[in-house]
Amino acid sequence: MAQTSAERGLAVYEAHCSSCHSPDANGDGPAHRGVVGRRAGALKDFDYSPALRNSKILWTRATLKAWLTNPEALIPGQGMDYQLDDAGDREDVVAYLATLKRPRAR
């Protein structure tokens, strides 16, 4: 059975992103659960760069793909020095990130 884009994205995420990020815990980078639809720099418990915190970017599939293509071009002065060179990998990682929904409030 062929893998879905999100399944491929999980594999790419684990290989290229998980040394700094995870779905639920901050590391060198912020946690990703609920990132699609969230404002950049919005997690209160993560120390973002001033450029990212003040960017007013909304993380959509399109802005996340632009970010993964070249973070510095999207938000000059941000702190992430990594990008995904393969467009398919970017598409798949964004598909995976979109599966990481925020838990519903009780």
Placement of each model-derived feature along the sequence:
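Short Fe-S-cluster ligation motifs
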Residues: D45-K65
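Mobile acidic interaction elements
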Residues: S18, S22-P23, R33, F46, ...
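Short glycine/threonine-rich turn/loop motifs
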Residues: A6-E7, P30-P50
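Solvent-exposed, acidic/flexible segments
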Residues: A6, L10, A25, I57, ...
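A generic structural signal for secondary-structure junctions
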Residues: A25, V36-A40, T69
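Sequence/structural segment immediately N-terminal to covalent heme-attachment motifs in c-type
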Residues: T4-G27, H32
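C-terminal capping alpha-helices of c-type cytochrome domains
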Residues: T60-R106
